[in-house]
């Protein structure tokens, strides 16, 4: 009877040990999975990465021919944007460049620790830093037109610091760092889009055009129309106005207008004025933290994400069917628009080349880093396989047995 009881206890003890060993092994494998395979997705068939990690961006053109020389420092745009510090993104919104869509991306589509608070019926969102009630974004949809409607580079650089000092007085103890960004668009498409917008009644007459501490006089900036707006104007009428701010708008809004006497056209000769404006716009564009092109939405998204180390929740969409795209114009009219926007044509050609070179540089750098990581992982895997197994000289030991159960068994 005692032998049966002793034998029963032995069987129970062995069964308990086996259950403990199996449970411990399962826990060990789960822990090992967490450390060894964090990049795998249980929900993705075939071990593929989840959709967020798939490469949504176009492959760089290997046959792209560079037009301009840019040093590496102009192609490297990897900033340490400190949202919890005193850094501020300032969006320079040029009319009819897709800035409204991009501006909404900034307040509604960026993956943030503390998302912007956008409430129905309100035109502005509250974009506070994660650690305090201060804004990290200066834009139409966050701070409104605080420096005037569609303020340009000259206005923003002189206005933004003061506006934020008044809004966030507690931040006066440390200087802010401003990161200017903008979007550019093909000049002909942008010009036609602005004409259609004006034709529907838009005026932007509340824009300040502040420069050197004052607004332009009526003599310096005469209106193109009489009355409240220019609705119903024909394309020919739009092109015939010599004071139309749509002409070379992108260069004017990116240049330092103080260099040419602001809107005083008699300050310097016309040819020299044009050259100074173009060179200033190129310089300021290069100095910006980021700029995108309306015609390349996915590449614009890619460069913004890599520049600021921020991720968008949803990918950008390329919409080629715009109001400007529906306008039928003949070749003579297109040439006329190109002549009226000659400075913008030169700037866009320059910007497009810089944009493409930055994209290619970033993609090649990223691919190179991926290859290096893959090579290191393969070498590490081979090194682990080459290590001798320490438990190979202990026959009879169950592979899934943990250390404590092995010691108990020896007792």
Curated annotation (Swiss-Prot):
- Any idea where this protein resides? Membrane
- Tissue-specific expression: Expressed in fetal brain.
* Protein EC: 2.8.2.-
Tell me what PTMs the record reports for this protein.
N-glycosylated.
Q: Where are the glycosylation sites?
A: 264, 320
Annotated substrate binding lies at 123-124, 140, 145, 150, 197, 204
- The lineage's top-level taxon is Eukaryota
Biological process terms in GO annotation: angiogenesis; heparan sulfate proteoglycan biosynthetic process; labyrinthine layer blood vessel development; lung alveolus development; neuron development
Coiled coil (UniProt feature): 352-387
Q: InterPro entries from the entry?
A: Heparan_SO4-6-sulfoTrfase, P-loop_NTPase, Sulfotransferase
- Residues that hold 3'-phosphoadenylyl sulfate according to the record: 93-101, 185, 193, 317-319, 323-324
What residues sit in the active site? 150
State the reactions this protein catalyses: alpha-D-glucosaminyl-[heparan sulfate](n) + 3'-phosphoadenylyl sulfate = 6-sulfo-alpha-D-glucosaminyl-[heparan sulfate](n) + adenosine 3',5'-bisphosphate + H(+)
Q: What does this protein do?
A: 6-O-sulfation enzyme which catalyzes the transfer of sulfate from 3'-phosphoadenosine 5'-phosphosulfate (PAPS) to position 6 of the N-sulfoglucosamine residue (GlcNS) of heparan sulfate. Critical for normal neuronal development where it may play a role in neuron branching. May also play a role in limb development. May prefer iduronic acid.
- What protein is this chain from? Heparan-sulfate 6-O-sulfotransferase 1
Q: What is the organism field in this record?
A: Homo sapiens (Human)
